[in-house]
Regions:
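GH16 jelly-roll
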Residues: 21-282
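Bacterial Sec-dependent N-terminal signal peptides
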Residues: 1-23
Length: 282
């Protein structure tokens, strides 16, 4: 109980500190989603026609999958972004591919690119086998040479999240990955601050301000080139099923990596990711 109370206190401090950061000189980017629509000067909405990783959703630009609420009733400081997965059988992409699910994905490519500093987001996430939301960063160019920083991923087991790096020689089932177990009494369905501190020689991941995993330049160079000296953009998305979830839950039906109970949660309208704010500092 003591650990839980300490974590809650730390989380409240982090939340307030982040909101205060928007007026400080070291703030590169701040978004607290307090409007009724997405700020398109800061964010791009992705529309996909061909998915990767055997994921089961298409990403669309719709107020059904990306919308905003008065976040206070959900525990957010001001407004909150909601990324919602929807069961929509027969959805056809512009390439003619059919999907049973649609969801949302946004990024800051060419609108906010940063090199080094700290990136963080306060999020609350639905759990369920195969629900795969993420907060991450990519460089421009071909993957994996561009470098990928997975600040937070979860594939439906609410008791843990993962951090990872992908680059040339260490991608896919990357050796540079860590699974962080939540303290007793909390899980992904509660509000947490997920962050990474990025320097010229290391990346340090944090959960509610606590260091969970550190990767150094020499660690990556055991496998390939250090791919973290170039500008990156942020991504928030909510994927469904696919290779990573299947590797954990071994589910193949009714959908690859996505369980029936999670499908039921999507159909009931309860598969949602809440984002209170996103902050980048130098």
């Amino acid at each position: 109980m003591k650990n839980t109370l300490l974590s809650l206190a730390a989380l409240l401090l982090l939340s307030g500190a982040a909101v205060a950061q928007q007026t400080k000189k070291d703030t590169v980017f701040f978004e607290d989603f307090n409007k009724k629509s997405l700020n398109r000067s800061k964010w791009n909405v992705e529309i996909t026609g061909n998915t990767v990783n055997n994921e089961q959703q298409a990403y669309i630009d719709s107020a059904a999958t990306l919308y905003f609420i008065d976040g206070k009733k959900e525990g957010a400081k001001n407004g909150a972004l909601v990324i919602k997965a929807i069961y929509k059988p027969g959805h056809t992409s512009k390439e003619g591919k059919k999907y049973d699910f649609v969801s949302g994905r946004i990024n800051t490519r060419d609108k906010m690119m940063f090199t080094y500093g700290s990136a963080s987001a306060r999020m609350k996430i639905a759990d369920g086998a195969g629900l795969w939301p993420a907060f991450w960063a990519l460089g421009k160019g071909e993957w994996p040479d561009c470098g990928e920083i997975d600040v937070m991923e979860t594939v439906g087991d609410g008791s843990w999240i993962s951090n990872a790096l992908h680059g040339p020689g260490y991608f896919g089932d990357t050796p540079l990955a860590h699974r962080e177990i939540f303290l007793k009494g909390t899980d992904v369905t509660k509000w947490h601050v997920y962050s990474v501190d990025w320097t010229k020689t290391s990346l340090t991941f944090k959960l509610d301000g606590k260091v969970t995993y550190t990767v150094t330049k020499p660690m990556t160079e055991k496998y390939g080139r250090w791919a973290f000296d170039n500008p990156k953009f942020l991504i928030l998305n909510f994927a469904l099923g696919g290779g990573y979830p299947n590797g954990v839950n071994k589910v193949t039906r009714p959908y690859f990596g996505l369980s029936q109970s999670s499908v039921d949660k999507i159909k009931a309208g309860n598969a949602k990711v809440y984002v209170d704010w996103v902050l980048v500092t130098k």
